[in-house]
Amino acid sequence: VEFTTGNYKITTTPRREWQYIVDNVPCPDMGHNRRLIPISELLQQEVSQNANLSEVEVIAIVLYTGPMFQIYNTILRQFPEDKFSIFKDGDNLYSTTIFVLVSAVQKLSRFTRIPLGTMLYRGLGGKMDLPDIFFQIDSKGCSGYAEWAFLSTTSDRNVALGYSGVKERRPKAMVMVIETSSIDRGADISEFSQYPGENEFL
C-alpha cells in the first residue's frame, strides 16, 4: 500500500521502509537530514544495552521514527477511516509491530533520564480546534484528552512550531506544552530517530 506522509511528503510503502531499515537497501528520500543507522550499530549503543532492547524492538522504534509513524497511528486511531479500512480489510493491523514498539518504549522509559519538569512540545497542525471538554476540569481536578495512538513530542520548541501550522498561516495553529512527571514520562527516542534533529520523545 503506497502512502504519502503529511510532514515531509514522502511517498513510500511499508515494504520499502522495511527494506531501507532492515535490509539496508539505499533510500532515495534522504531529505530533512534523514539518517539510517544500521540496526547492528544501534543495538550496541549504551541506551540499547541498558534498556536490554531486542533487535525487533530497535527495528520497531526506527521504523516509527520514519514514515511508518503515519500507518501505525492511523491504525491505533482508526482514523482517517478510509485509510484505516485499507489495513483492516487487508487483515494487517500491524499488531505485532505495535506491541513490540510499546515494549521498547516501556523499556526505554525506565532507563531514559528525563529531568522532572522537562517541557515537551507537540505541534497540532493548525487544522482543527481542541474540543471544549479538553479545557473543562472534572470532579478530580483533571482536564485533557486520551490519545489512542503514540504521542510524538519534541524537546525543541522550534521543531513543534514547524508542525503547528503557523508557517502555513493556518487559523488554528497551536503547540501543546507537556510537563514531564515521574509517573508517565515516555522515552527519549532521538538516538534511534531517522530524523535526529527532531529531538523526539514518545
What are the language-model segments listed below?
Residues 1-202:
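Mono-ADP-ribosyltransferase
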